[in-house]
């Protein structure tokens, strides 16, 4: 009995006074106290397993950007609850299912899914207007930038673009029976032409297969390179879109450091200069990022001064906890005031509402009508 008490006391002292001792050393300690304890067989990992483990840890580890984005400034402890007007509808319908199946078959990506757009089902099925639309994302699914609002994955060195993607995208879109398509892309700062050639080729191939389809290109800023802007603007599209994302004062808080307000405005001006007559330019901003009404008005005035034809306002929705928080949920009444203000400023069309996104079915329905009206006028003039 005395021997057992002595053994227990020795074990307690060893565990209490040697907290730095690793778990792997416990068997040898037990053997010292009780020689009858069997020794486990050593099984050191192979070099290959170690290399694989390092790769997995590196892939799963949070980046500095993840850490930065997860830090919320201010005293709010809980995210704002969603108001009743932000209810989302469940995607569905035969056309929705058909488009989704074709996307999986050809391994294509849509920003509708990547960005978790709440209007996905409505746009793909055609909704009330009957104008079914979709937004295809080309140049891969990995962006070279890391904006604080965006859910698309990022990397400094994404995989190279698929050379067959322009043909695959054109064939898929031509088979869907859509009337209006939005083609967008991730930023590709790693490519010499920022991906503009790939973009233009996709538009051109689609025009060959389905010349009557209306095409909107929602492009990155191409780092402001005029040659890249010209390449896409003259590719045969009907709408050249580039989003400024937020008001001028919040650009550095919301967007990647390589993007800025002046560069985006210059891209929209260049597009208007290079594109054929009748091509519309378009941009969009999110509300609920911390902007003031005066900042929204000032930014909208500068966008209109750049000759932009179409503008949309929508509510920022936080994709995950590592993204910037929602500052406020802007009311439908406020969105309507911004819409009315934009119309008064001279925009040809303004879409404004909590669920509006830059690529939005209802907006595309009206843009389609505008383009067709312009075509009719041009035909009459001839």
Swiss-Prot record:
Binds 2 [4Fe-4S] clusters per subunit. One cluster is coordinated with 3 cysteines and an exchangeable S-adenosyl-L-methionine. Gene3D superfamilies: Aldolase class I (3.20.20.70). Disulfide bonds: none annotated. One of its GO terms (molecular function) is 4 iron, 4 sulfur cluster binding. InterPro entries: Aldolase_TIM, Elp3/MiaA/NifB-like_rSAM, LIAS_N, Lipoyl_synth, Lipoyl_synth_mt, rSAM. [4Fe-4S] cluster 2 binds at residues 143, 147, 150. Its cofactor is [4Fe-4S] cluster. Pathway: Protein modification; protein lipoylation via endogenous pathway; protein N(6)-(lipoyl)lysine from octanoyl-[acyl-carrier-protein]: step 2/2. Pfam families: LIAS_N, Radical_SAM. SUPFAM superfamilies: Radical SAM enzymes. This is Lipoyl synthase, mitochondrial. One of its GO terms (biological process) is lipoate biosynthetic process. It comes from Oryza sativa subsp. japonica (Rice). Residues 25-46 are annotated as: Disordered. Keywords: 4Fe-4S, Iron, Iron-sulfur, Metal-binding, Mitochondrion, S-adenosyl-L-methionine, Transferase, Transit peptide. It catalyses: [[Fe-S] cluster scaffold protein carrying a second [4Fe-4S](2+) cluster] + N(6)-octanoyl-L-lysyl-[protein] + 2 oxidized [2Fe-2S]-[ferredoxin] + 2 S-adenosyl-L-methionine + 4 H(+) = [[Fe-S] cluster scaffold protein] + N(6)-[(R)-dihydrolipoyl]-L-lysyl-[protein] + 4 Fe(3+) + 2 hydrogen sulfide + 2 5'-deoxyadenosine + 2 L-methionine + 2 reduced [2Fe-2S]-[ferredoxin]. The gene is LIP1. Residues 1-30 form a transit peptide. [4Fe-4S] cluster 1 binds at residues 112, 117, 123, 359. It is found in: Mitochondrion.
């Amino acid at each position: 009995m005395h021997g057992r008490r002595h053994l227990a006391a020795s074990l307690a002292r060893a565990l209490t006074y040697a907290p730095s001792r690793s778990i792997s050393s416990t068997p040898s300690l037990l053997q010292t106290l009780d020689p009858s304890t069997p020794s486990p067989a050593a099984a050191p990992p192979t070099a290959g397993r170690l290399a694989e483990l390092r790769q997995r840890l590196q892939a799963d580890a949070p980046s500095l950007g993840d850490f930065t984005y997860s830090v919320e400034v201010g005293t709010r402890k809980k995210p704002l609850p969603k108001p009743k007007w932000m209810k989302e509808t469940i995607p569905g319908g035969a056309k929705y299912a058909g488009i989704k199946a074709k996307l999986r078959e050809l391994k294509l990506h849509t920003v509708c899914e990547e960005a978790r757009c709440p209007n996905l089902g409505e746009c793909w099925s055609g909704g009330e207007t009957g104008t079914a639309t979709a937004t295809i994302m080309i140049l891969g699914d990995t962006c070279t930038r890391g904006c604080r609002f965006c859910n698309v994955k990022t990397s400094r060195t994404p995989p190279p673009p698929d050379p067959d993607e322009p043909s695959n995208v054109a064939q898929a879109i031509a088979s869907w029976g859509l009337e209006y398509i939005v083609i967008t892309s991730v930023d590709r700062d790693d490519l010499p032409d920022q991906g503009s050639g790939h973009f233009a080729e996709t538009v051109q191939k689609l025009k060959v297969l389905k010349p009557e389809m209306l095409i909107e290109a929602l492009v990155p800023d191409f780092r402001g390179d005029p040659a890249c802007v010209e390449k896409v603007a003259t590719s045969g599209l009907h709408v050249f879109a580039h989003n400024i994302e937020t008001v001028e004062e919040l650009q550095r808080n919301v967007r990647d450091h390589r993007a800025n307000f002046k560069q985006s405005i210059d891209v929209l001006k260049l597009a208007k200069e290079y594109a054929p007559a009748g091509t519309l330019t378009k941009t969009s901003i999110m509300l609920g990022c911390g902007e003031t009404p005066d900042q929204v008005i000032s930014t909208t005035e500068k966008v209109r001064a750049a000759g932009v034809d179409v503008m949309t306002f929508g509510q920022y929705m936080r994709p995950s906890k590592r993204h910037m928080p929602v500052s406020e949920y802007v009311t439908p009444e406020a969105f309507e005031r911004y819409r009315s203000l934009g119309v008064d400023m001279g925009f040809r069309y303004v879409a404004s509402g909590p669920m509006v996104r830059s690529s939005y079915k209802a907006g595309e329905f009206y843009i389609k009508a505008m383009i067709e009206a312009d075509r009719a006028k041009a035909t009459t003039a001839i």
